[in-house]
Amino acid sequence: MPKQVVIPPGTGKPLAPYVPGTLADGVLYVSGTLPLDAEANVVHVGDAAAQTRHVLETIKGVVEAAGGTMDDVTFNHVFLADWADYAAINAVYAEYFPGEKPARYCIQCGLVKPEARVEIAAIAHIGR
């Protein structure tokens, strides 16, 4: 199966030369997703929970555009700007993965947009 680019309708312009998702051999790779609007402005500044919800809704859109659901997500890379947001981010994260949880790692680091509190990248196995 050839590589397929996945760009959901209404997706804004990326900050760099990448696409929201790439599907290859049934595996969807979702790029690092920041809490951005269509003009690449950070939304919900200062609210880690709202930013996490925005990020996960964006990821959900990419997964669905590839023909999957959030149940198909098998791995997440979670990047936090501040460990103080860990509990708030986890509370929202748990809403999107209520049953079987995907594997993940979580690290604190600087993000490309200083107002962003969280960035998440994902891997999903579509049609498993």
From Swiss-Prot:
Pfam families: Ribonuc_L-PSP
Keyword flag Signal: no
Molecular function in Gene Ontology: deaminase activity
InterPro entries: RutC, RutC-like_sf, YjgF/YER057c/UK114
GO cellular component: cytosol
Functional description taken from the UniProt entry: Involved in pyrimidine catabolism. Catalyzes the deamination of 3-aminoacrylate to malonic semialdehyde, a reaction that can also occur spontaneously. RutC may facilitate the reaction and modulate the metabolic fitness, rather than catalyzing essential functions.
Lineage: Bacteria, Pseudomonadati, Pseudomonadota, Alphaproteobacteria, Hyphomicrobiales
Top-level class of the enzyme under EC nomenclature: hydrolase
GO biological process, one term: nitrogen utilization
CDD domains given in the database record: YjgF_YER057c_UK114_family
Reaction(s) catalysed by this chain's protein: (Z)-3-aminoacrylate + H2O + H(+) = 3-oxopropanoate + NH4(+)
Protein name: 3-aminoacrylate deaminase RutC
Annotated family: Belongs to the RutC family.
Organism: Methylobacterium radiotolerans (strain ATCC 27329 / DSM 1819 / JCM 2831 / NBRC 15690 / NCIMB 10815 / 0-1)
Enzyme Commission number(s) from the entry: 3.5.-.-
